[in-house]
Amino acid sequence: MFGYYAWLAARSLKRNWVLTTLMIAAVGLGIGALMTSLTIFHLMSGDPIPHKSDRLFAVYLDSWEPESDGQPRADPTWPSQLTWRDASHLAAAGQAKFQTMMFRAAFAVQPENTEVKPYTAVARMTYADFFPMFEPPFAFGGPWTRAQDAERAKVTVLSKATNDRLFGGEDSVGRKVRFGDHQYTVIGVLAEWDPRPRYYDVVSGWAFETAEEFYLPLTL
């Protein structure tokens, strides 16, 4: 019986090969779209740091004006990010064991190695507490301290890719690097770390972008 149905299928394929090709392509596209959706769902629904995700909180405050042009505000949603004033006051209150403000900024990198041309790189400006909160692994050295935050120390933590580019992957702790108009001392170098989505900054549109190339104290 199977052989008979296989013979009928072969005859149908030969007689309507264009339609058969279109049907196979449609099924293939459907499977591809399904697998893409399932992959994105898996990545978005996973817990990137399960041992402490129940103790990490993103703070939201309603900083909108209560009225707009004399009329009640129609959109009841809160802003996705804090104002600088609100974030600064929360940080100064120091109510959490670890807490940090952060944002991304672009700098011109001027390598000491003349064989490496200057280029623009993206940094994350943050506090020392960023590192114990989100636990990026270190290959060399370590993070700066709260005291160095207060001192506005010109120190930096490099990503693995940046350390490879500037120093050939060597232990660069103690070396100098120039970002913009200032020189910074390398205090630590991360091991490979590129979480997707970037769970520590999902509200600013960078959740699936490449990781920052270095980290600087926000107090600078």
Residue ranges and their predicted role:
Residues 18, 95-96, 171:
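Glycine-centered tight turns that cap/initiate beta-strands
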Residues 128-144, 154-220:
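Mid-to-C-terminal secondary-structure elements
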Residues 2-14, 86, 90:
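A short amphipathic helical element positioned immediately N-terminal to and/or at the very start
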Residues 16-48:
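Short, strongly hydrophobic transmembrane alpha-helices
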